[in-house]
Structures are given as structure tokens and as C-alpha cells.
Amino acid sequence: MTVQFIGDGNPDGTILQNLEAIRGDAAERRGGVLTTPPTATGTTTLTAAQMTGGVLVATPAAVATYTTLTGTLLEAALHDDIDDDDTFDLCIINLGGAGDIITLAGGTDVSIIGSATVDDAGADINSSGVFRFRRTTDNTFVAYRIA
């Protein structure tokens, strides 16, 4: 799996780093590789693959809470070169039925800023949510709802 960091803490913000060792693949340098996205159903603690895959396809059959990894486990899942202010995105797409709302909850040392709910596909509003996770210090992350 490849996750691309949006920023690296440098003021110019031009450096993009991959979570895995850079393969030298030109397509990867332009935007990464998206394989078949991981999935989730009912209430769960997300795995590293679900959090860092870029896209998570959800099919809950009822109201569900998806809890992030703890800050310590999330940092362990990322590459060794992660720095303060590095970021990665997670898009949750909710394909659940009417009323099957997902709430993203932060594990220990992970805070959510903005709306943490991803409404069902039948709702009048978006049934997906994009969260930008930013490392603030060792083993600590903030997830911003950006879309």
C-alpha cells in the first residue's frame, strides 16, 4: 500500500514522501498508486491498512463507529521518516442504507476536528468524508475534516 504525505513540515511544502520506500516509479511520484480499497462494515477499530490506504469503502448495516488506531500504533504503521506536520488523507465512502451513519472516533492521542460523521448514501448531504491526519508530535495526531 502506498500513502502519500501532502506536506513535510517545510515552509515551501513541495516535498512529497511515500509511506513505503520510494520505488522510483514515475507514476507513483505523480500521485501514488491506489489498489482495491480496504472495506469496513459495522463498528470497529480501523486497521493500519484501512487508515493508510487512502480510501475506505464502508457498508454498515446500522449506525457504526470507526475508531482510529491510537497515536502510537498509527505512528508505528507509518514510515520511520515521519516528521511533525506530515499529513496523509483518509476518504471514507459510506455505501450504507438509510440511517446507517458512521462516526469517526479518535483513538488515544488522536483528535478529530470538524464533523466526525459520514452520512448514509441516501442522505441529502455527502455520503463521504475526507479527513487529513497531521502528526503534531511523537505518537500524536489531529484529523481535520476537510471535505
For each of these PLM feature ranges, what is it?
Residues 3, 7-9:
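N-terminal accessory interaction module
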Residues 3, 15-111, 125-126, 135-147:
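Exposed extracellular interaction/assembly regions and N-terminal maturation sites
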Residues 109-119:
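Short aromatic-acidic-glycine turn motif
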Residues 119-125:
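Short proline/glycine- and polar residue-rich coil/turn motifs
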